[in-house]
């Protein structure tokens, strides 16, 4: 007994979950589709058919009201599914009613149910020819007008929606890259864009169901009339006139009770797909737009009045329309003349009051990176072609993240009327870090050898590197390229300048919050390293200062686990950030040598002579790791001249070498060189990878 009861007990949760799912509506659609399949197979009694026909009529009206009252098509994304299910439901009802008409038609007009009989008598009014004509008119209106029109609208909407997707996607990415929207807002917009394309694509296909339903209704009606007369006359020996009258009444009633919901849902489909360009609900939009123009209303009033005066034409209907349109036109004219009345809330808002003080927090907020454009450069972001600038900024974010492991903050772009017409300014934390001018419609041309461009144009200096350049006309592009010149457009000039400024200020832009984010985004396999290091061995602030020091010398922090391991190795022996950085750089030897190698794969170096090594070592003063450089000014000038001469000779030979020093003096040599040659790389002997191939090109 216990074993027998076990299956029943185990089945109880599944039955309960099935009932709960039905109550929540999760299985309603599945059961509905199963019910439609049952209609196709099992005979349905007339009372049950009456209930199902009432559900069909009521449901179609509900769908139409929903289509009218929604504000945008995406509020009714389930409409294609609803369209398919209701079409199948009507076809199932047609088959069930056909079975009743042909099998019980000899019993009289009530053989197929009270609903079909009532519709048949209501439309025919004792004359079945009238019913046939009305039914044919409904079929023609539904098939030729409503269904065909809504299908065409759905087809065009789907095509244009799919064609516009790339542009809309680019606009979302541009707003995200410039900081106009957040990552969450971008996700919401992308999801809405995907829903829109899917919806209109589904509507394009679903409209074909409505068209097929109209054709099927016409064919089923003809079959019912012809088949019913044959069955009544041949099988049941009914007089031909009685058979024709009885079966026609039931068939027309069946056709009407099926085609009226079909027509209503076809109208709903047209409403949904035609709302793409309408703001708000359809009733408010139509009321506002049709009655807003007094000139149009006046012409309608005059036209109706003229028609009312035609001999034989009934005066009252047209005169009433003329008076109504004229009164509405007069009211619109008067409303336009008098000032708009304010409601109490508006009056309270308009009353003189003390200006609302802006929150202090809004004044404290600053933009990490900002580009200000002169009035003449607004087309760089407002025109369709202007997306090139935002696209390049987005690509720059990816490049900096890939090369340096540095996530560039959002760039805010805005206009500044105080700038020159075609000028721009780049600000880092609200401070101007660079400025320049570009020429829209022209191209910047530069000689890679550093000479002056021998083409007509405006000779200037390239803003990022200060090289000689010339703004040339666009039609000289091919000639400039043929001569071997470098040619770039205005957006690229601005982006290149922004790139160099960001590289110079990466250390300042790496905030404490950004460091915390980098640590959190490390793989799970590295979480133990972070937990062991922070805060037990070093603080997050110390890690931030180490990363800033590396970025200041343009060393990539992408290999963050390796950097943390270097910090963890040196931290027990020193608290000096300088010494921590030196230890980390030694662990990054492979990366440093690879990043600074020449075209031939060798690392070009300029060595520091023994005299200068000794001079720097003797000039270090202070206890422990907190040493300071105290080099006499005269010796400092000699060193600067020596560095310049050595690197200029290397540049003439086509080399871009690094300065190689001993580990003890490297940070102090770098602190001097960054003042006059910020991009020069200074490496110590500990940072040379054992497999690196060196090429000495000079000595200081």
From Swiss-Prot:
Main location: membrane
Subcellular location: Cell inner membrane
One GO term of the biological process aspect: bacterial-type flagellum assembly
Short name of one Pfam family: FHIPEP
A single cellular component GO annotation: plasma membrane
Transmembrane segments: 27-44, 48-65, 76-93, 129-146, 218-235, 256-273, 306-323, 364-380
Topology in the lipid bilayer: Multi-pass membrane protein
Keywords: Bacterial flagellum biogenesis, Bacterial flagellum protein export, Cell inner membrane, Cell membrane, Membrane, Protein transport, Transmembrane, Transmembrane helix, Transport
Superkingdom as given in the UniProt entry: Bacteria
InterPro entries reported for this sequence: FHIPEP_1 (IPR042194), FHIPEP_3 (IPR042193), FHIPEP_4 (IPR042196), FHIPEP_CS (IPR025505), FlhA (IPR006301), T3SS_FHIPEP (IPR001712)
Function: Required for formation of the rod structure of the flagellar apparatus. Together with FliI and FliH, may constitute the export apparatus of flagellin.
Family in the record: Belongs to the FHIPEP (flagella/HR/invasion proteins export pore) family.
Protein name: Flagellar biosynthesis protein FlhA
Organism: Caulobacter vibrioides (strain ATCC 19089 / CIP 103742 / CB 15)
Source taxonomy: Bacteria, Pseudomonadati, Pseudomonadota, Alphaproteobacteria, Caulobacterales
UniProt gene name: flhA
